[in-house]
Structures are given as structure tokens and as C-alpha cells.
């Protein structure tokens, strides 16, 4: 089957809940369902605007509040933290499929050797957590008057915590001021958590289902099997799902990228549907839609560079650029900073793609979204310093003045 590039993009956008078709409940339950549908939400430390995990969820539900994610992890146990492959929030219902990864880490020769070399420290760390309850790495700092170098030394203790977490012996009970709080896995897992080790075939089918459900359309390479499972088993599972008719292989017109795969049911729905209203999104660079940079270039002809690690003189787009998605294409980038003391969202630069010129309908939509994003970042106004092209700064500023005030669901604290 052959599909257009536009259809492929719409499949990807729909799977990510960015085309207005998701029907999620309001509040925390809607956030939990968003995590389940996305499969994972990547965690990141950069905080020039709301951190990536909060930003990603806000992009799907504008009534999202950061406290909702905390409750889903710390109280409701609907999500947990683990590697996917970076640190991520994951649906608790998928916990069992990560057990083989944990077991593989625990049984690796490198881990066994490290544990043998640090056996006393491991024992002391586990005993403290069992006795005192959930602890952060900072709780293992050396007490006043005690020399560093003993088991109280923070760095070795932190390494133990991270090793035991990767092995599945400890879990993150919650985050306090973004610091991980570790506890025994048996005390974090909810009573109804499924802890049965999946068979190789079960896990392979899970990997294919998660990839297609979250990506909408993907090549075998883009499914990321090598990071988590056996490539051969996943390839067999994919082949079986194609044979059963669940999955359809497609070629994308205009792309020399080999076969891609999509759910047959979704493919039929999107292929037979005319384009609806364009939705505009300001996305995190760690958003699930853009995190695979190679796929982003292939499917959307868009480059999303993270330049915060570059010297300032070598940055083309800015410290922490946010892609602008409008309809089924990426039309530009923003380099923002939330000054919460001044309650101002500063857009240091708004840049648009060289081949994009349809500014008249875009600017009002962008202005409205910027005001909502500002509210989400606890800011009351938006200031645009520069634009590329330069001629757009005045009309964008004018559009911001005319944009409707964001509702409380745009990220304002609720009481």
C-alpha cells in the first residue's frame, strides 16, 4: 500500500494526541490516560520553561497541573519511573514488560562484580531505607564531624541507589523538589501490579504495539527494539501482526525510506478523512513526537537541535528551542525563557522556516497559544524580542495584544 507524506504525518500526529481527536477525561484521570497512550513521557532537568515531562502532558491536556503527575506517582501509583531508554514516566500497567531489562542489568557480569566490590555499602543502604523509609541521595551525605570516605560518602551511596534502581530492587516513590526519593520496590508497587515475567513473544508483541500506538507509523528501525528487547523476536511479532491483518506495511510517496508500518484500522480511518481544523502546538524538544531526531527529519523535514550544550556563539536557534507544529508541519521554533519573578514569558527569538510564508492565519493562532503557554509557566505577559523574518515582530506583538486571555485550564493554579 502506498500513502502520501501528508497521510503519514497525520498518522504520527494523531497517535500523539495532537490533532484534537483524543477524548480524555478532565483532570488527573485524563493525565493518566495520556501517559498510557503515549507509552512513556521523558523526564528532563532543564527548567528555563516548565520541565519537559510537564510540558509534554500540558500539550495533550491544557488543564494539566504538575501536581497531577506527582499524585499519579506518589499516591495513586498509576505511573512509575524507569529507563525508556532515558529516564521516563511509564504506565504502571506496563511494569512487567520492564522486568527483563531489570533482570538483565542485575545478572550482567559488570553489575555482579560491582556489587561484590561494594557489598557492605549496598547492605547498609538497603538497611537504612528499610529502617527509615524512603530516602533521597542527599540523605546519605556525611554527618557533621564524620570523615568522607566511609559508607556515608554521598557519591558511592548515590551509585548504589542508582544501581539498585536499575536492577529493580528500589523504585522512585516520588520526587521532592525534583530529587528522586528511593524506596524498596515491594513498598512502592501497588498490590494489583502485575509482576509476572513476560515470555519473549509477549514482550516482543508489547514492543511492537507500544511503538505503533505511540508513533502511528514507523519503520522497523524506528521502533527502537535494540534498546529494550530482542530484535529477531520483535521482527517475528511484527511479521505475525502483518499476516493477521492487524498491521499494514506501507510505502510513503516521495520518501526513499523503505517500508513503514501502521495499524490497519487507524490507517483506514486517517486515509479516508479530509483534513480538519489546524491545531497549533508549542512542543518540548523532548516531546515524544520530536525526540527521534532522525525520524523527525525523514517524516517532517525538520531539524530540532538541542543547543543548550553549545557555546553561545555557536548556537543557531537558541538555548532551548521549542518546535512549533501547525497542522501537519513544523513551521518554526521559539527560544523562550520564563521569568517567573517578573511574570513574563520572554521569547528571545521566534524563527520560522524559510519556505513558510502563510503568516496571516498563523500569527493569531501562535499568539493565543503563547498566552496559554505563558499562563502554564506562571507568567502573565509575553514579550517577543526578535523574530526571523524581522518583519514579523510587530504583527506578532499586535496579535498577542489581541489574543483572548487564557482560561484557568491553560495552566493557572487551581484552588
Regions found by a protein language model. Name each.
Residues 1-415:
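Long, charged, low-complexity, helical-prone intrinsically disordered regions
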